């Protein structure tokens, strides 16, 4: 598993690589008309009447039976019919009349198209009847879910992103329980309800055993149809969702003639000629109700960013930056609708986001800025043999088959491969005279690769008042990493601006993770108003850790100090956990419900940063470093952490008021901390809890004016010496408040919005012995405002925006956390990442 001395060259690939998947997708899209023709059925029975005897019950089962008996092709998305009932069909009917009878009261209607029929929403359903899969693995009405569910529609997201708000920041604005977003590449610390979230694209997890926080550096918002959010601990989709689930649903093709969507945009603070970001995106979709597809490419190029004082924002050399960055997102999808409700959806994505410039942080000649001898500056002339970058390839196929032994069957198979490279980072030790100590110093950048694939199978059986959802998940993941070492003399002479690679060594031990799960979820409509639900998930996870020579010893060997070293033993560890949930939803009326639930989530915190640590002899013995003690599987295995949560909530949706409010309390018996010297994980046997309120309310004052607000009021604590103390600010979530006022009048819309994050403090770092070190920290809150707008033109739409309307100069939450993490041996100014100042955005989009 571990090959620490080998490394693939991580060179920038040309844009032509991005075009290859696009050309393939365009070829598939071009074949849609012929594929649709082959899939179409000739129907000649529209006017013929025949006898039917279809019982009342599941609408989807009734439609499938009707299609078989009538000999007609019915095309519909399973999300449309999930959870809906029919009164049945008995007697003599024609096709049109029979469909009308079956669909009565469902909010759906049938449309004759391409020799068959397709189902469409009549638009009469309330928001609470929206179908989502995030809460129960199969399409379910929000009104039946005992939990906090949010849906971010494409129009809401596009209003933000076309107005210039970056994706991570837009999510923090639109999802009440999600922390405000950082402005660099990382989304570390952007928690939900104070804990980590499971992020997915079309149901495929973006989380990995190695906790690299780049889940939102994964897709261009041009390709997002909607975002489904379930707040709080959940085991519905497996591990990692101790704070909630965010499922990013991508855009699909639409039936009909080929349709094109074009978008261009520009963003600038007008501080210098380099202060600009620009983007361009293009998609094509089309087909029939039987076969349809979409292909797209989105490209963005970023320049420099400046804060509210007119100074350039410091480049993030810890988790990497998005200044001087370019990204390409290529996506393609095909959707097939077969007879009797069967469907197949295929999706593919290639995403590449990385550094593309010649600027870097000047650390001073001989790294003098690291000693506080001179300020850190951003200068030209940067040349790195390894550049910060995220590259991801993902494929998935989803098949739906109704009437499989009386069940609905959902099958999904998927594959994800990603490579993540980091910025060159200085680990420099100085002598008493201020000279560099070469034996204890190095300049390096890591690369971390993950391959992830699996299969999900879900069966749904509906009776009159009871629905059973059960199935299995199979997941396989392989993680490997390495570290490029750069010539120390060259780096010192250039202030770190030139990184010439001379060796490659291991960074973390290799980790293979296998996970197999069985789950079952039941829902019972005890009355027309009361729905009870409950479920269990049994998950078995196997971690196989490779033997690993500690990174520090590999670096010493690369310097010629020794020729070999003992490996810290690897090994295997099995985890088996049972996770339960149960809840109740009571419908006060058609527009509102109250609910209560208990749920559990599970996570295995970053085994790569836990294992592979060791203490060696002070010097090599006959050229060999002798291991004295190490963190290994046999002697100090990492424990999984189970999070439990209780929640009470209320939601209300009608024509004027949309509101949702939940009170939650989550707790776990273990927690983790980060060693400030090594930045590695240490496990604590101390309890941790989060509790608070999450809510949102939007109200239409008139047909033109809307106001709204959302809030997360949260407190995060850990138990030290039988007392509840404040949790470390690097992991706790600050409370948050958002508000907006919007106006629209036909073709014009305006929105003024603000977000306020509140102060957060702790009592110091928690050490491995469970005690505080006495160095307390504080994160200062701040408030920023944006003005967004749009104007429909005779052809297309113009969107515009001003971010940070008041040009406030502030340090982001991540910038303040980074100073806590990294400033033990380096001046904090290097990690003082400010927010971007007043920035103007303009974009134009057109569909044709």
Segments from the language model and where they lie:
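A beta-strand signature from Gram-negative outer-membrane beta-barrel systems
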Residues: 219-263, 847
């Amino acid at each position: 598993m571990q090959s620490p001395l080998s490394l693939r060259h991580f060179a920038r690939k040309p844009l032509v690589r991005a075009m290859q998947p696009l050309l393939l997708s365009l070829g598939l899209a071009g074949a849609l008309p012929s594929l649709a023709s082959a899939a179409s059925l000739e129907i000649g029975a529209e006017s013929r009447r025949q006898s039917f005897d279809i019982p009342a019950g599941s609408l989807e089962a009734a439609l499938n039976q009707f299609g078989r008996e009538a000999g007609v092709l019915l095309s519909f998305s399973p999300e449309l019919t999930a959870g809906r009932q029919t009164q049945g069909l008995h007697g003599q009917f024609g096709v049109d009349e029979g469909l009308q009878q079956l669909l009565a009261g469902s909010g759906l209607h049938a449309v004759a198209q391409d020799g068959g029929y397709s189902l469409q929403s009549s638009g009469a359903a309330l928001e609470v009847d929206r179908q989502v899969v995030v809460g129960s693995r199969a399409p379910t009405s929000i009104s039946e879910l005992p939990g906090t569910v949010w849906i971010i529609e494409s129009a809401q997201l596009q209003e933000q992103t076309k107005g210039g708000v970056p994706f991570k920041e837009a999510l923090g604005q639109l999802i009440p329980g999600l922390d405000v977003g950082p402005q660099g590449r990382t989304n570390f610390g952007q928690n939900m309800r104070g804990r980590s979230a499971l992020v997915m694209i079309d149901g495929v997890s973006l989380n990995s055993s190695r906790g690299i926080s780049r889940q939102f550096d994964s897709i261009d918002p041009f390709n997002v149809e909607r975002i489904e959010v379930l707040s709080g601990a959940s085991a519905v989709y497996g591990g990692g969702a101790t704070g909630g689930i965010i499922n990013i649903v991508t855009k699909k093709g639409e039936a009909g003639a080929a349709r094109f969507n074009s978008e261009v945009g520009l963003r600038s603070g007008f501080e210098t000629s380099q202060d600009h970001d620009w983007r361009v995106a293009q998609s094509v979709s089309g087909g029939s109700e039987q076969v349809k597809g979409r292909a797209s490419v989105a490209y963005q190029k970023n320049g420099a960013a400046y804060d509210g004082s007119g100074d350039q924002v410091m480049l993030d050399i810890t988790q990497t930056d998005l200044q001087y960055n370019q990204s390409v997102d290529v996506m393609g999808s095909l959707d097939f609708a077969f007879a009797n409700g069967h469907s197949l959806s295929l999706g593919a994505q290639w995403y590449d986001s990385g550094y593309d410039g010649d600027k870097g942080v000047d650390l001073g000649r001989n790294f003098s800025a690291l000693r506080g001898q001179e300020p850190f500056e951003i200068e030209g002339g940067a040349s790195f043999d390894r550049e910060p970058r995220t590259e991801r390839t993902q494929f998935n196929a989803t098949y739906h088959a109704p009437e499989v032994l009386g069940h609905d069957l959902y099958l999904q198979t998927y594959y994800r491969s990603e490579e993540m490279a980091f910025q060159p980072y200085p680990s420099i030790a100085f002598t008493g005279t201020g000279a560099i100590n070469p034996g204890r110093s190095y300049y390096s950048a890591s690369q971390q690769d993950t391959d992830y694939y699996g299969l999900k199978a879900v069966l749904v059986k509906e009776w009159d008042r009871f629905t059973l959802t059960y199935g299995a998940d199979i997941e396989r993941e392989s993680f490997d990493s390495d570290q490029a070492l750069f010539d120390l003399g060259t780096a010192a002479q250039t202030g770190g601006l030139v990184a010439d690679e001379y060796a490659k060594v291991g960074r973390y031990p290799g980790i293979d993770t296998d996970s197999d799960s069985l789950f079952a979820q039941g829902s019972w409509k005890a009355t027309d108003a009361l729905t009870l639900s409950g479920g269990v998930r049994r998950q078995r996870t196997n971690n196989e850790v490779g033997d690993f020579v500690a990174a520090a010893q590999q670096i010493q060997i690369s310097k010629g100090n020794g020729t070999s070293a003992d490996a810290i033993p690897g090994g295997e560890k099995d985890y088996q956990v049972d996770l339960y949930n149960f809840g109740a939803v009571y419908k006060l009326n058609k527009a509102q419900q109250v609910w209560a639930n208990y749920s559990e989530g599970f996570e295995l915190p970053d085994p790569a940063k836990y294992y592979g640590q060791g203490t060696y002899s002070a010097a090599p013995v006959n050229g060999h470093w002798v291991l004295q003690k190490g963190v290994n599987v046999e002697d100090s295995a990492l424990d999984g952490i189970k999070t439990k949560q209780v929640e009470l909530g209320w939601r209300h949706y009608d024509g004027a008021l949309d509101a949702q409010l939940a009170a939650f309390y989550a707790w776990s018996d273990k927690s983790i901390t980060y060693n400030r010297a090594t930045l590695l994980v240490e496990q604590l046997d101390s309890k941790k809890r989060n509790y608070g309120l999450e809510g949102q309310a939007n109200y239409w004052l008139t047909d033109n004016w809307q106001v709204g607000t959302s809030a997360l009021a949260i407190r995060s604590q850990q138990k030290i010496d039988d007392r509840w103390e404040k949790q470390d600010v690097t992991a706790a979530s600050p409370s948050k408040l958002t508000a907006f006022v919007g106006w629209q009048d036909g073709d014009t819309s305006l929105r003024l919005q603000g977000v306020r994050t509140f102060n957060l403090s702790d009592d110091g770092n928690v050490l491995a012995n469970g005690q505080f070190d006495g160095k307390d920290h504080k994160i200062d809150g701040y408030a920023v405002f944006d003005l967004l707008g749009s104007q429909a033109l005779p052809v297309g739409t113009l969107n515009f925006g001003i971010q940070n309307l008041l040009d406030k100069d502030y340090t982001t939450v991540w910038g303040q956390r980074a100073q806590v993490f990294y400033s033990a041996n380096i001046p904090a100014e290097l990690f003082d990442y400010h927010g971007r100042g007043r920035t103007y955005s303009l974009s134009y989009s057109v569909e044709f």
